[in-house]
């Protein structure tokens, strides 16, 4: 998820021009898109959400990430090919509309909006959990309320200078992970004193790699995929490339760098401590270095992630606000959400208000379910993202003239997505997340049916009648 740092801002800007022609010329080079993608894809889902995956499957989480990276590459590659063949600012929702009709574009757009609302809830909860590192007695909902209010205030103040701050904070996140990798390697080689416990050793037996069996490995896939969430937004940003045909190359390099960072850092973390030492309330990288004499690290690392994570959440709020304006502009949401208030820097307050209600829902959930809220929201957000990824793959079958090998690869990508989604049904502690995502899909589906029979068909009939009258 998570939709991420300056990507969310870019998403909003691209969304505002969703009807623009594909002939627009950008000035971004492919390697710049790769670097931006790395910085904005790394989010709180990785710094905290990966802990759930580790506790679910153990050291084999690194293999989960490799499979998720492969699935992500397949999705991005297909999206990049569609972008190169028919560049459109609307990106994946436009292609769903083109392939299957207006109901698909409508469903894709609202599903994406819903997934981002859940991702914001996940980010809000993650920030609150990380803050409890210093203030363990402060209730989760109180932290969530504070972060939500400040985030809304930042959006109300406007976007001036925000992108530059986003880039700096994306760099902070990446630097924090690089810092962990360097320190962890030093620890593995014995350059730091270990305060009790066994020295680091990589598991080399099946039951050590898969302590929860293949069932646990299957269940963990959703969290690995969730960490790669946001790749579809890079598809939107591909419109800014000077050469649109460079989109697949940019995505390949970006995913390669991300996979190396993820696998190396998590591989080091699971090597350094036992499975039982990880906690959902703490970053796995902080947990991994708990037994070493590094008093500064937890505070520096935690602080860096909270600052950057807050920026990511605020950017996501910018993004969902602009996305709803686009849905409204396309006739897929009430016209109310297009309205902008001049007194508030032309900000679409109705659209922001609906996003704020989503944050309020997360706060209420944190109050009612403080123990499991992060697992539930993260799981459901990850599943909703994968539903859109499935839309991307299915759309490619109708839009692209793929060779047989490309079709086989696309089917394999669908199977990986199916495995990740179905794996959430195997573990009762995260199963509610699946049903939450299903509830969203049912609501969106019913809304699409209503729009088809009560709005779109009616508008089509009126247009046909007007056309006939004109001919007469």
Residue ranges of predicted features:
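Helix-loop-helix connectors at the membrane interface of multi-pass transporters/channels
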Residues: 94-97, 124-144, 176, 240-244, ...
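Membrane-helix boundary/coupling elements in multi-pass transport proteins
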Residues: 111-124, 233-241, 298-335, 378-379
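Extracellular loop-to-transmembrane helix junctions
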Residues: 3-4, 25-28, 48-143, 254-260, ...
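Membrane-interface "cap" regions at the ends of multi-pass membrane proteins
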Residues: 1-49, 54-57, 73-77, 89, ...
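Helix-loop-helix junctions that connect adjacent transmembrane segments
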Residues: 12, 17-24, 139, 170-303, ...
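Membrane-interface loop-to-helix entry segments
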Residues: 141-198, 251-256, 382-391, 402-413, ...
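TM-loop-TM module centered on a large, flexible mid-protein loop between adjacent transmembrane helices
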Residues: 94-96, 133, 252-314, 333-381
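A generic transmembrane alpha-helix motif of multi-pass inner-membrane proteins
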Residues: 187-188, 376, 381, 385, ...
